[in-house]
């Protein structure tokens, strides 16, 4: 019997964190009778007087959101991290380690209208979002070791407010995922004298089978090691290390790429496609200001939960929680489906 990746179970290594993913393509034929999600409704009003992220509405803490006309950033009313916090006492017990955690949490509204999302915004409006990301990054990266820009879109990914927005959490420490990448990227660079993701981009361009979108500045792929069904990685092709390295032209092409990718997502199942996404780049702050970042390549990751339709999602439970990550649809099959979906015209505009 000859191995066929699209038919037989196998494991794939994620070189960014050293963890393996179990791929079981034969399971795509199994019947499904599990939980189905309610698709997010698209009939949202432009303005909701009860939504605290809308212009002019008073938030639960009594602060009125200003009448903003573009992006709007404010300090999170219920932050996970705060800047002033007592330092924990020293503890030498290896089983009860504790460390300080300082930081800042902000909310950033993409647009004053509640019924828009990134795929239904114009490229020019998305450029404004990117510019604000960079402005916030410039300010916060001077002080903090890690600035995590991320968006949770849709109730299926825990988003409690449908208004188009993201969050920016800044940490005095390097969080777990970036720390793993820092170590793996640095080790690869020490051995190969090349950034891992620069080599990865070259290899994917040669193979073509996992590419979703390709242009001069950006590459979108379903990673070889993807865990989520339609997971994608948006990678800089210009040796950018951090988001504030981007030129005006690269920002505009990024806006076009984000719009095309998220339009493909929405068109795949003709719904407002939920996901969690975020940016990863070289660490920042005084601790990392003078350290080499040659091993890093700026990239974003999209983790969408939907599997078979707008109402069927993947759950990370059982074996995934207790043993290792597992997927059914192969990354190559997912990439082909995303490639074939229209990314230029949103289904609501047809």
Swiss-Prot record:
It catalyses: alpha-D-galactose 1-phosphate + UDP-alpha-D-glucose = alpha-D-glucose 1-phosphate + UDP-alpha-D-galactose. One of its GO terms (biological process) is UDP-alpha-D-glucose metabolic process. Homodimer. Pathway: Carbohydrate metabolism; galactose metabolism. GO terms for cellular component: cytoplasm; cytosol. The gene is Galt. GO terms for molecular function: UDP-glucose:hexose-1-phosphate uridylyltransferase activity; zinc ion binding. Keywords: Carbohydrate metabolism, Galactose metabolism, Metal-binding, Nucleotidyltransferase, Transferase, Zinc. UDP-alpha-D-glucose binds at residues 76-77, 152, 167, 314-317, 319-320. Residues 31-52 are annotated as: Disordered. This is Probable galactose-1-phosphate uridylyltransferase. Belongs to the galactose-1-phosphate uridylyltransferase type 1 family. Its EC number is 2.7.7.12. It is an enzyme of class 2 (transferase). The keyword Metal-binding applies. Zn(2+) binds at residues 54, 163. The active site is at residue 165. Its cofactor is Zn(2+). It comes from the Eukaryota. InterPro entries: GalP_UDPtransf1, GalP_UDPtransf1_His-AS, GalP_Utransf_C, GalP_Utransf_N, HIT-like_sf. Binds 1 zinc ion per subunit.
